[in-house]
Amino acid sequence: MSTQDLMNTPGYYYAIAYTLSVLVIIYTQEHRVGKWKILISNIVQFVLLMLFMQWTHGVSRTLFIPAMAVIITVLLLHIYYCCRFSWREAGFYLVKAFINGEFAASFCWQFYYYICEKMNTHIPIWQIVNLVAVYAAIFAVLYLMEKSLQKDMDELHITKRELMVVVVIAAAVFAVSNLSFLDQKGLFSGRLVMDIFIIRTLVDLSGMAVLYAYHIQVKEVQLRFEKNTLHNIMDMQYQNYQLSKESMDMVNQKYHDL
């Protein structure tokens, strides 16, 4: 396998990573449809991604963005179909799933490239073992993180502003992480293969950190709002109770005077 082949992450790495990333979201959220429909939808989505990404692997820079738009659309429709989300919430979780998948595929292939470089050979069985082990570790951690974000909150309501924030973050992360692949002579592009891998992986990891930090912030703001709303309702009920009690006392006093 040549250096050029090693530099280009295979399409099926991304197809598997996107699928697993979306599965993490689906199986930590409330479902819109039954288990069998979700299973069928998972299979259809995976097959579509696998075929499309193998077909578009190594596509020209002109068609790169349209190809990514197709992939993102497939992921969005799959999440919306399976989860009890509004379109805004589906978009919010899609952005997280997409960047998570980008990081997983990038890190997994970088790790395999590192092994090939150290051993000075390409061993297919190690490629499979590496893929299974790295993906299992990454998505197990992401699953636990998503489950922890569900604590104390049944449903996360996303506003247009919050959706736009994560879209802008993801677009910036994706653009910066792919600069070296689209233009290796650019101002912010890496020259060596490992430099390119490091830039992409670290940028994707940073994007994940920012998105999860923002998710936590959105959750805390919503929890604070719900607590304040509940406190106001309880306060109003208490005031109404006090008024009712005072009215009853006045009526009783009048009856007593009579």
Regions found by a protein language model. Give the residues of each.
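Alpha-helical membrane-embedded segments
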Residues: 135-140, 168-175, 196-216
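Juxtamembrane or sensor-core-proximal signal-transducing alpha helices
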Residues: 141-155, 180-186, 204-236
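Hydrophobic transmembrane alpha-helical segments in integral membrane proteins
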Residues: 1-18
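Conserved DHp (HisKA) dimerization/phosphotransfer helix of two-component histidine kinases, i.e.
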Residues: 237, 244-258
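N-terminal, Lys/Arg-enriched amphipathic/low-complexity engagement segments
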Residues: 42-46
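Interfacial loop-to-helix junctions that mark the boundaries of transmembrane helices
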Residues: 5-8, 125-127, 192-197
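Juxtamembrane segments at transmembrane-helix boundaries
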Residues: 6, 18-39, 52-168, 173-187
